[in-house]
């Protein structure tokens, strides 16, 4: 009888593991991002001797599908209407769609919207989160643009602000607009990182935390998204050692809730 009972418990455990995302991705504070098998949508990085070594942050596009899936099925598991103010290339939309939730994603790039449709068969909306009406939502999954690091073809985006100060001012205005349409109890998943360019350090993760506090959002969790296993560390280290700073091989997943 004991053996039969044990067998039933084992089978039950296996069945649970198929449906519980916490079995697929360990709910711990350091998440090892999986390799996506390509350099990124915007093309390969130029590592030639005639070019300066670019910021390691430029390897972090597109959005990691495993992170999107984990957010959709774990942090947003009890949410239904997910908004994305920077919809991007479609990975997040697909993850939300696969988890049987509603997704509305705004993006100012026709190229990104076309890619999302062609690659993932999802329909993002050509709209600007700075000016267009924000939909009511109870969840959010996004990754904001990294000023002076990535440029889109539309000149209406935050990435085209002429200074870091102007970027941060408009960044806060955008989040004020978005969070006002979030229902009480909403959960936000924001993937964000820091980077260095031309010897200047840009702390977008800290700036985002400050903005969320101003918007009345409460911190719920923070996860380190580690790219250590898939980053070209050996290529980055010489310049880091010469200038005395660390190579950025991680991003953050900031989880916020609206009271």
Roles of regions detected by a PLM:
Residues 1-259:
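Class I S-adenosyl-L-methionine-dependent methyltransferase catalytic core
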């Amino acid at each position: 009888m004991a053996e039969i009972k044990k067998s039933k418990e084992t089978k039950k455990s296996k069945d649970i593991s198929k449906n519980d995302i916490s079995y697929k991705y360990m709910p711990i504070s350091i998440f090892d991002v999986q390799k996506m098998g390509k350099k990124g949508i915007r093309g390969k990085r130029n590592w030639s001797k005639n070019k300066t070594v670019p910021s390691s942050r430029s390897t972090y596009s597109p959005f990691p599908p495993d992170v999107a899936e984990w957010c959709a099925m774990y942090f947003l598991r009890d949410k239904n209407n997910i908004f994305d103010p920077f919809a991007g290339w479609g990975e997040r939309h697909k993850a939300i769609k696969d988890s049987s939730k509603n997704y509305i994603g705004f993006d100012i790039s026709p190229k990104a919207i076309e890619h999302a449709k062609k690659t993932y068969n999802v329909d993002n909306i050509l709209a600007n989160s700075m000016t267009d009406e924000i939909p009511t939502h109870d969840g959010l999954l996004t990754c904001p643009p990294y000023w002076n690091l990535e440029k889109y073809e539309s000149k209406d985006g935050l990435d085209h602000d002429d200074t870091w100060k102007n970027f941060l001012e408009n960044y806060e205005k955008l989040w004020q607009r978005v969070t006002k349409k979030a229902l009480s109890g909403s959960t936000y998943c924001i993937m964000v990182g820091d980077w260095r360019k031309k010897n200047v350090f840009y702390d977008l993760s800290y700036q985002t935390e400050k903005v969320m506090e101003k918007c009345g959002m409460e911190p719920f969790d923070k996860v380190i998204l580690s790219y250590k296993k898939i980053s070209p560390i050996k290529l980055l280290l010489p310049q880091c050692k010469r200038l005395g700073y660390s190579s950025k091989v991680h991003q953050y997943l900031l989880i916020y809730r609206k009271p």
